[in-house]
Amino acid sequence: MLKKASAFLIASCCVMSLAWAQANDNWYEGKPISAISFEGLEYIARGQLDTIFSQYKGQKWTYELYLEILQKVYDLEYFSEVSPKAVPTDPEYQYVMLQFTVKERPSVKGIKMVGNSQIRSGDLLSKILLKKGDIYNEVKMKVDQESLRRHYLDQGYAAVKISCEAKTEAGGVVVQFTIQEGKQTVVSRIQFKGNKAFTESVLKKVLSTQEARFLTSGVFKENALEADKAAVHSYYAERGYIDARVEGVAKTVDKKTDASRNLVTLTYTVVEGEQYRYGGVTIVGNQIFSTEELQAKIRLKRGAIMNMVAFEQGFQALADAYFENGYTSNYLNKEEHRDTAEKTLSFKITVVERERSHVEHIIIKGTKNTKDEVILREMLLKPGDVFSKSKFTDSLRNLFNLRYFSSLVPDVRPGSEQDLVDIILNVEEQSTANVQFGVTFSGVGEAGTFPLSLFCQWEEKNFLGKGNEISVNATLGSEAQSLKLGYVERWFLGSPLTVGFDFELTHKNLFVYRAGSYGNGLPHPYTSREQWASSPGLAESFRLKYSRFESAIGAHTGYQWYPRYAVIRVNGGVDFRVVKNFYDKDNNQPFDLTVKEQLNWTSINSFWTSVSFDGRDFAYDPSSGWFLGQRCTFNGLVPFLEKEHSFRSDTKAEFYVTLLNYPVSAVWNLKFVLAFYTGVSVQTYYGRRKSENGKGNGVRSGALVIDGVLVGRGWSEDAKKNTGDLLLHHWIEFRWPLAHGIVSFDFFFDAAMVYNIESQSPNGSSSASSSSSSSSSSSRTTSSEGLYKMSYGPGLRFTLPQFPLKLAFANTFTSPGGIPKTKKNWNFVLSFTVNNL
């Protein structure tokens, strides 16, 4: 740090006397900065530096701005020497380029772990900050040394010793960590002394440290003892023993019994004291809120067993009542009053009320790519506003939902005056790019097709650090080729108005049934719907292959509000699409009316609108809260030009509740979440298409379907039967986050049903429809036995933006007559993690 400060001071002092001596003194003042360049780079990518300093391009040069840029250069800690220079970029000296000639610090050529035998080198490398290819930094090396030591202590190696050194070699620096592990220490026994009110077995359950057993490692952690002592104290304090304490923890180490491990016996000495009851609370000095309002925050009844934890929670809720309304500088003090004879504990709370606090500054630290305005616009608090705790919490939720940051640490500090506060946001950015490419199987089972296709997708959710989204998606295969482009501006004209555009080109080779000659609305050679529905597949000779070309352009917009109870979003968009099918019309006629009509260039336009209420804590991986959304889509905007006219409604609801959230370590909680979802979709046709379908001349495309992937997991083999006009879909998931924000183990129960509104019968059921009213009634009664397609099973759900996949095994079943009828085989399901917004 001393070297860094000295270098910065020297550069600042020389700026006016040497580095900036050009044609005229101070010619660069007030001139726009056209570029910032770095000379002397060897290992550091220029693009990385361009991203960091691009925000300064176009700004006018000032001495303060120059110092800010120079400070950021030194903060990178990439360079041992920095020489600044101002260079004109035009003969008239109207633009200035800041040129930094630098000498890079050496890069890390390699990292070695020496002496470790019990913990793999790969595990140790994952615990350190320095990586191969990074610029060497001695401070980071020392931090990594301490990180490794803490990791060993967490694994029970209490006597571990770690040293580090940097060896300069050709091409960089090799960092070496030398480790003396020692023997692992495990807890063989835990015992208590002095406990009378509670048994030893009860108190053991309070501790995070456990005895070594068959399914419990029992690793001894020195730093866990203080937390365990506090846990015992809290357990007693919740039950009226307000003076209870753990006087000490004796450790008896056995080094002889087990040659590979040290066995330790922990003995907790407890002083319990007397049990007290709650004697009530007196509040003085309050004027803004009534005494009754404040007393209601403490949910303890006079005469009940004293619960210190509940009282502290109530006292905090009382303080939050002021804090929520902007009174952050109030003084609150509580005094205990004991009646040792009656064994009661009462309190007196003194409130000194002051003026409301206002936000003076919002300070952002740690950003390199993201512009400050992208963060500030998500804040519901602005400089000059009355501070509100709920708005502050909701602002943090908005920032977390952006998924731009791997770490976000907020802080509220006093401002320049008593009634002013500064909000400080310490952030650490993460990658917002999503790049996917690979090979997928397509056309499997089709004669004469090449069963592979290539795909590539690039998506950037924080384009140029401005919070906008851009995406490119391309697919190349023998049966399908597509190109999709998308752009979304999340805050249009500085308001929470979203504006986006999409463009798509697609070519596909598809199959359709040939039209029959029976005039009964069935494909050749089938004579009844029962025969068609029960057929496992169609013979190759009865299928018509055709090519389909689509071109589409769409636009969408949305607006959102932030009331206290939820985030409200209203969205809408239009989609303009032209399609054309290619097939031999002289010798073949398709059974599908849509395919037949689209032999000529056909326009398909649609309009959609949606509204949602989002009360989830985090939109992308919720643990609590709820969501309610409604979307309506109108296909066919021009009555006489377009032939496809339909309306679709989608209603969705979600609910999440946390069942368990137990801190196992400083970085991981054992967490269980229960998630519920229900959805109803309805699609109806109107106009010409509705009348033509009623004549039995064909079938319509785009019906609702149980696809077996996103809807009705595991039912993909029956997708052609499971289509209709009404779709009901429900699921329940038990979620266990294995790595928070990355991957979760889920166990799901899924139920879905499609229904044909016109025929008044469920699709995919075993019963047949009948033309007579009595037969139809009987059919509907029989069909109702197997309406829902159900499934259950385990799976892994990835919540990373770069890897939004679900991997699951599903066992499908129905319930005819209320009796579950399961299948023996399990189906593997690969789907995407789709979050409703």
UniProtKB/Swiss-Prot annotation:
Ranges for region Disordered: 761-785
POTRA domain segment(s): 31-105, 106-182, 185-273, 276-354, 357-430
InterPro entries: Bac_surfAg_D15, BamA/TamA_POTRA, D15-like, OM_assembly_BamA, POTRA
Domain of life of the organism encoding this protein: Bacteria
TM annotation in the entry: 434-442, 451-461, 469-476, 479-489, 500-520, 531-543, 555-568, 602-615, 624-636, 645-658, 668-682, 725-736, 742-756, 787-799, 803-814, 825-829
A cellular component term, taken from the record's GO annotations: cell outer membrane
Annotated signal sequence range: 1-21
Bias type Low complexity, positions: 765-784
Keyword Iron: no
Positions on the Periplasmic side per record topology: 22-433, 462-468, 490-499, 544-554, 616-623, 659-667, 737-741, 800-802, 830-837
Keywords noted in UniProt: Cell outer membrane, Membrane, Repeat, Signal, Transmembrane, Transmembrane beta strand
Industrial and biotechnological uses noted in the record: Recognized by sera from 42/43 syphilis patients, it shows promise as a diagnostic antigen. In further diagnostic tests for syphilis this protein exhibits a sensitivity of 86% and a specificity of 99%. A fusion with TP0453 (residues 32-287 of TP0453 fused N-terminally to residues 38-450 of TP0326) exhibits a sensitivity of 98% and a specificity of 99%, and exhibits superior accuracy in classifying analytical false-positive samples than a commericially available test, making it a better candiate for diagnosis.
This protein's record includes keyword Repressor: no
Induction: Transcribed at low levels, estimated to be present at about 100 molecules per cell (at protein level).
Subunit architecture: Part of 2 complexes of about 239 and 164 kDa.
Function summary: Might be part of the outer membrane protein assembly complex, which is involved in assembly and insertion of beta-barrel proteins into the outer membrane. Both rabbit immune serum and rabbit antiserum specific for extracytoplasmic loop L4 promote bacteria internalization by rabbit peritoneal macrophages. Pools of human syphilitic sera from the USA and Columbia recognize both the N-terminal POTRA-containing and C-terminal beta-barrel domains as well as loop L4, showing this protein stimulates the immune system in both humans and rabbits.
Family affiliation: Belongs to the BamA family.
More about this protein: The outer membrane of T.pallidum has no lipopolysaccharides, few proteins and is a fluid and very fragile bilayer. Its lack of surface antigenicity is thought to contribute to the ability of the pathogen to evade the human immune system.
Domain notes: The N-terminus (residues 22-369) partitions into an aqueous phase and is predicted to be periplasmic, while the C-terminus (residues 426-837) partitions into Triton X-114 and has the hallmarks of a beta-stranded protein, suggesting it is membraneous.
Name of the protein in question: Putative outer membrane protein assembly factor TP_0326
Organism: Treponema pallidum (strain Nichols)
